[in-house]
Structures are given as C-alpha cells and as structure tokens.
C-alpha cells in the first residue's frame, strides 16, 4: 500500500515539475482593439509619377505599444498601418497632409482613396494590423477593404473613424470599426 502511495506522490511531483517548466504562452488573441491612442502621419509628398496628388500613410498604436526614439516598436499591443493614402492637392493651402473627408479603399490612386491590404510573398502591403508582443511580431491581420472618415476637431486634432473589413480563417467577412482621436504626429518620409 505504501508503495502505491509513493508511486502516486512521485507521479504528482513529476507532473507539477513538468508543468512548471513550460515556457510562458504567448498572448491569447481576443480580437482587435477598438481604440488607438498614438498616431503618426507619414508624409511622402508627390511620391508617384502616375498619381497627381500627395501621398501619406497612417501608423496607429494601441495602448501598451509605443515607438522608441529610433521609431522601433516597444511593448505589447496592436499597430494599424495604412499605406498609400491619396490626398487631394492643397485644398487652398500648402498642405501635403490628410484632410477632412471620406477615404475609400480602392486601387485607383484618386484623391480620397487608399490601397487595400494585400500579402505580396509574405510581405504585408496596403492596410493591415500587426500584433506585437514585447517588441516581437506575433501575427498579421490583412484588411481587404473599407473606408475612413476624417474630421478636424481643432486646428491640430483629428477624429478618425474606420470601417474596415477582413476575412476570418473560416472565410466569413468581419467588420472592424476602430477609432482614433488626437494629434497626427507628422513624420517626413520624402
């Protein structure tokens, strides 16, 4: 009887020892964030010969994720990136930046449009969401279509309402509606 008790205790200690030696599990995906708290507007100016107006990109960060002085991601959170946003020429001023209006996802290069997300040989382009954990990329969610409503709330503040779409792993279409309100920090990329 004691022999069975010792074997049972030994087995229990072995199981506890094994489970405590496992590496920590990565973040369990619970859905994309509804709010972004930091945003950079990358200003490319007149970047394409075939496109008449200026081009910008949006680089937004959720709580917990930030950029260091070298513009490298630190922390844990989400990064919504939308490249190739085609803004109208000047609008009566000298700006090359995002102006108020409704921008649609399409491949035309016309003002008030932006490119949809696409995976080019493992490289995300257009619009996508990165999940970063402790500065390391964990996942990429491509966004295939949608629109952005940009409002000026003050001379420096913007209100961005996104309605973006993507396909789930099972093929169903998912609507993603994040929001940002604040300053779009300019980052000259020309």
Please state what every model-predicted region is.
Residues 42-55, 151-157:
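Short, ordered beta-strand-loop transition motifs
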Residues 22-24:
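Bacterial signal peptide processing site
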Residues 149-190:
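C-terminal or internal capping secondary-structure element at the end of a domain, subdomain, or sheet
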Residues 30-48:
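Post-signal peptide N-terminal segment of mature Sec-exported envelope proteins
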Residues 51-151:
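Surface-exposed helix/loop patches within compact recognition domains
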Residues 6-12:
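Sec-dependent N-terminal signal peptides
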Residues 17-20:
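C-terminal motif of bacterial Sec signal peptides marking the signal peptidase cleavage site
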Residues 1-4:
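Positively charged n-region of N-terminal signal peptides that target proteins for export
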């Amino acid at each position: 009887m004691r022999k069975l008790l010792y074997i049972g205790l030994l087995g229990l200690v072995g199981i506890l020892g094994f489970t405590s030696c496992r590496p920590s599990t990565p973040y369990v995906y619970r859905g994309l964030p509804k709010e972004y708290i930091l945003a950079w507007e990358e200003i490319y100016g007149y970047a394409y010969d075939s496109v008449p107006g200026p081009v910008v990109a949006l680089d937004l960060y959720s709580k917990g994720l930030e950029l260091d002085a070298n513009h490298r991601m630190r922390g844990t959170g989400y990064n919504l990136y939308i490249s190739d946003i085609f803004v109208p020429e000047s609008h009566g001023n000298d700006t090359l930046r995002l102006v108020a209006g409704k921008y649609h996802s399409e491949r035309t290069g016309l003002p008030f449009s932006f490119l949809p997300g696409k995976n080019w040989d493992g490289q995300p382009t257009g619009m996508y969401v990165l999940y970063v954990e402790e500065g390391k990329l964990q996942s990429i969610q491509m966004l295939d279509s949608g629109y952005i409503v940009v409002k000026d709330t003050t001379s420096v503040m913007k209100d961005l309402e996104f309605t973006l779409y993507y396909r789930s792993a099972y093929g169903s279409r998912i609507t993603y509606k994040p929001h940002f309100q604040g300053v779009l920090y300019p980052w000259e990329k020309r």
